[in-house]
């Protein structure tokens, strides 16, 4: 079992198996100075699947404890996790979309090419302004990506909507 250690709002490992298997082959996390860092979303996903364990000191954290840590830091953590999990389970590579004003950037398979989609996660009861939608679509269009809204309903089902410019 690959062991990661909690460090603020992420986890890290220096284990070469983690770097080779999770980063190089499956595109999880970010490699910085010989350490593989995973977000809490990635860590929760991998713990849930039995691929890694996360420790805080010597204590092993459960999936629920990781979820609670995520919820403390992000009110949309549950919705983001459902979308992250759904996309990963479908075989996509999912990375942070923060620098593009979205929650995720999504790659078809692996990371050999540029990401194709920017995904914005919203609970179904969210109120959207036209300006919010326009701003996100404009950014996606400007970086040649498709804008996807991932709507999470109260039954934890995810529905994806592609939002794009239409020219008449």
From Swiss-Prot:
Q: Which enzyme type, at the first EC level? A: lyase
Pfam family example for this protein?
Answer: tRNA_int_endo
The disulfide bonds in this chain are none
Under which EC number(s) is this enzyme classified? 4.6.1.16
Q: Which CDD domains does this entry report, sorted A to Z?
A: tRNA-intron_lyase_C
Q: Name one GO cellular component term.
A: cytoplasm
Metal-binding found in the keyword field: no
Which keywords belong to this entry?
Answer: Lyase, tRNA processing
Active-site residues annotated for this sequence:
107, 114, 145
| Gene3D superfamilies assigned | 3.40.1350.10, tRNA intron endonuclease, N-terminal domain
Q: What's an example GO BP annotation here?
A: tRNA splicing, via endonucleolytic cleavage and ligation
One GO term in the molecular function aspect is: lyase activity
Reaction catalysed by this chain? pretRNA = a 3'-half-tRNA molecule with a 5'-OH end + a 5'-half-tRNA molecule with a 2',3'-cyclic phosphate end + an intron with a 2',3'-cyclic phosphate and a 5'-hydroxyl terminus
Q: Does the keyword Lyase apply?
A: yes
Tell me, how does this one assemble?
Homotetramer; although the tetramer contains four active sites, only two participate in the cleavage. Therefore, it should be considered as a dimer of dimers.
Q: What does this protein do?
A: Endonuclease that removes tRNA introns. Cleaves pre-tRNA at the 5'- and 3'-splice sites to release the intron. The products are an intron and two tRNA half-molecules bearing 2',3' cyclic phosphate and 5'-OH termini. Recognizes a pseudosymmetric substrate in which 2 bulged loops of 3 bases are separated by a stem of 4 bp.
Q: Which HAMAP family match?
A: EndA_short
Q: Which family does it belong to?
A: Belongs to the tRNA-intron endonuclease family. Archaeal short subfamily.
Q: What is this protein called?
A: tRNA-splicing endonuclease
Organism listed in the record: Thermococcus gammatolerans (strain DSM 15229 / JCM 11827 / EJ3)
């Amino acid at each position: 079992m690959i062991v990661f250690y909690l460090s603020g709002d992420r986890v890290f490992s220096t284990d070469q198996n983690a770097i080779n298997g999770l980063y190089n082959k499956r595109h999880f996390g970010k490699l910085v100075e010989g350490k593989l860092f995973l977000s809490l979303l990635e860590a929760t996903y991998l713990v849930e699947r039995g691929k890694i364990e996360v420790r805080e000191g010597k204590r092993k954290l459960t999936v629920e404890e990781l979820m609670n840590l995520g919820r403390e830091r992000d009110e949309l953590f549950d919705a983001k996790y459902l979308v992250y999990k759904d996309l990963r389970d479908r075989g996509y590579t999912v990375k942070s979309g923060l620098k593009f004003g979205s929650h995720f950037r999504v790659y078809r398979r692996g990371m050999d090419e540029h990401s194709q989609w920017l995904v914005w996660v919203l609970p179904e009861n969210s109120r959207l302004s036209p300006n919010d939608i326009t701003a996100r679509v404009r950014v996606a269009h400007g970086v040649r990506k498709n804008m996807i809204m991932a709507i999470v309903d109260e039954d934890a089902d995810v529905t994806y909507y592609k939002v794009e410019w239409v020219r008449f």
